Amino acid sequence: MTHIKTTIITAVLLIGIAFPAMAQIGEMRHNFAIGINGGVNLNKVSFQRKIKQSMPMGITGGLTARYISEKYFAMICGAQVELNFSQRGWEEAFELSDGTRDLSRSYSRSMNYIDIPFLAHLAFGKDYGVQFFINLGPQVGFLIGESEKASGWTAEQIASAKEYGKKIENKFDYGITGGGGLEVRSKKAGSFLLEGRYYFALSDFYHTCKKDDFDRAAHSTISIKLTYLFDLKK
C-alpha cells in the first residue's frame, strides 16, 4: 500500500510540474467561471480485514470555481477548485449458507464530509460547443457527522463486530480524485458539464497500527455529477 501511495503522489506531482510548463508556451486565456454542482455518490470502503459490501448511494453537491489559463494546440488548460458536501460510508452485505442474500440482518454507516478537490482541468474541443474534459488532482476532506443503522442483531453479535459502534478516529481525509466528461459551452447561457469521477483515499478513518482492529479503512467513491458554470471573465 505504501508503494501505491508513493506512485500516485509522484504522478500527481509530475502533472503539476508539466502543467505550468505547458502554460508558458500556449495561447493565453483569462476565463474565470463560477457555479454549482450536484449529483450522487456510489460508496465503498476498502477494509483489511475484508468486509462484504454493497454500494450505498449518497448525495454530493456544492460550489465550483474554474480558471482557464491557456490553449495549447487542441488542448484547453486550466485549474478548478470545489467546495462540496459529500455523503460517504458503507453498507454490509450478508449471505445465507446457500449464498443467497440474508435480508434478516442489515448494517450501514453514513459519513458526511466537506470536501475540497484541487484539480487540473484539461479539455479538448472548440472554445464554444461540445468539449471533452479530464479533471485530476488531490482532494482533502473533513468529517462533519456520522450515523449507523443496524437491524436483526443481538447485543452479543454487535459486540463481536469490531466496526459496529466504533467511532471514526481520523476525521481528516485526503486522497486522489479524477475523472472525465462532456461540457456544452455557449457564449450567453454558460457551461453545462456532465462528469464521472473516482476518489481513492490515501488516508484511513480508523487507526491502522498493528495493535488496531484494521490494517486499512479508506474510502472509495464513484461520483456522477452535473455542473453549471457562468463566466465572470471571458
PLM feature spans:
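Residues on the lipid-exposed face of transmembrane beta-strands in outer-membrane beta-barrel proteins
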Residues: I36-V40, G61-Y67, L83-F85, I116-L122, ...
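Hydrophobic, well-structured mid-protein blocks that either form specific transmembrane helices
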Residues: L96-P138
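Transmembrane beta-barrel architecture of outer-membrane proteins
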Residues: P56-G62, I76-G78, M111-P117, Q131-F133, ...
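Extracellular/periplasm-exposed beta-strand and loop segments of Gram-negative cell-envelope proteins
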Residues: K44-M55, R88-N112, L143-D173, D204-T221
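Predominantly the C-terminal beta-signal and adjacent terminal strand-loop region
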Residues: R29, R88, D173, G178, ...
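Short glycine/proline- and aromatic-enriched beta-strand/turn motifs that initiate or cap beta-hairpins
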Residues: A23-R66, L229-K234
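Cleavable N-terminal export/targeting peptides
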Residues: M1-R29, D231-K234
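Short loop/turn motifs that connect adjacent beta-strands in outer-membrane beta-barrel proteins
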Residues: Q24-N31, E70-C77, G125-Q131, S186-S191, ...
